[in-house]
Amino acid sequence: MLMLCAFIWGTAFVAQSAGSGMGAYSFLAGRSWLAVLVLIPTVFAFDAVRKKQGQPYGWPKEKPERKTLLAAGLVCGTFLFAASAAQQIGITINPSTAKAAFLTAMYVVLVPVFGLFLGRKGSAQLWVSMVIAVAGLYMLCMKNGFGGIETSDWILLSCAVLFSFQIMSIDHFSPLVDGVRLSLIQFIVVAVESSAAALIFETPTLAEYGANFLPVVYCGVMSSGAGYTLQILGQKELNPAIASLIMCLESVFSALGGWLLLGQNLSMRESAGCALIFAAVVLSQLPFAELRRCKKSA
């Protein structure tokens, strides 16, 4: 599920770069309202399936449960708004999707680091996987090095910090609430906050949305509506550090999408970067701890 999420996000980088000609908040507002429109029927569809299977469905009836769901949507939505806005602003200033993909994916390191402050101790296996993933990300995305740290780079690094908070918020709330409803409320929050920011700081026009119709639709329906819902559902029973590792595959899928769909050739360095990231994800999933326990009990 998170692998599919990474694929959708990876291909969305091209769409975001194509939409960098319009205001960052306007772009985010458009894609978020589209996500809301997609998620409303999705909630009803999930309810219908659950009803058929005899499982609990519908909105929470108890006040504490409703409060938890609303709090979850507000917290996750606010972090997602801030992270997505920072990402789009960074891409608008410097449309280098490669650098944006690398700097954004630094959440792969930040999530386990922040987890230490919450008492989550990562295994040596996990930390080795992180180092391999960062090396792979650098080889894949940074063909000519950093070329000096620019303003857009600091904005994209702040985006990685904010995405780390969003991932950890999802980790906290997803076992407590319905995932699809959390996704819906999260995007209502993002849509309202980004619309307010667009009206204050920008001048959105219908002509602007018409000129960027396809990027907004793809990011709204696929990246926001589908991708972030898959993230919530996929993270439900997974260590957030491992989840962040799997999701950093978005950089690999971004490069592979360009190769397959746009005819952009992958160099040996980029191919090696893809292989390292994939190896890091596989390494993080290998059950070394279980094998050691089995050997001890044998």
Where are these regions (language model features)?
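Hydrophobic alpha-helical transmembrane segments of multi-pass integral membrane proteins
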Residues: 1, 26-46, 71, 75, ...
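C-terminal transmembrane-helix exit sites in multi-pass transporters
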Residues: 38-43, 107-128, 252-272
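Hydrophobic/aromatic residues within transmembrane alpha-helices
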Residues: 19, 27, 31, 90, ...
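Hydrophobic transmembrane alpha-helices of multi-pass small-molecule transport proteins
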Residues: 39, 122-142, 194, 248, ...
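Glycine-/small-residue-enriched transmembrane alpha-helix faces in small-molecule transporters
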Residues: 1-30, 39, 78, 82, ...
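Specific transmembrane alpha-helical segments of multi-pass solute transporters/efflux pumps
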Residues: 12, 47-52, 57-103, 139, ...
